[in-house]
Amino acid sequence: MTPQIIPFFFMHQFTYGFLVILLTLLLLSYAFLSMILRLYLSRIYLSK
């Protein structure tokens, strides 16, 4: 590995890590929001 490539390597590692974290957060928030929405809707449905 030449010294010129090392910073790019670290940047790629950082970028991929960031993307993975972002995707995980998106999936978790999507699941969490759908769960909350389902609870809310079922509560409204049952209270009628």
Curated annotation (Swiss-Prot):
Keywords for the protein's UniProt record, in alphabetical order: Membrane, Transmembrane, Transmembrane helix
GO molecular function per UniProt: proton transmembrane transporter activity
Domain of life assignment: Eukaryota
GO cellular component: proton-transporting ATP synthase complex
Pfam annotation, one family: Fun_ATP-synt_8
Gene Ontology process terms (BP): proton motive force-driven ATP synthesis
UniProt source species: Eremothecium gossypii (strain ATCC 10895 / CBS 109.51 / FGSC 9923 / NRRL Y-1056)
Family affiliation: Belongs to the ATPase protein 8 family.
Membrane topology: Single-pass membrane protein
Transmembrane segments: 17-37
Name this protein carries in UniProt: Putative ATP synthase protein 8-like protein
Localization (cell): Membrane
InterPro entries assigned to the protein according to its UniProt record, in alphabetical order: ATP_synth_su8_fun
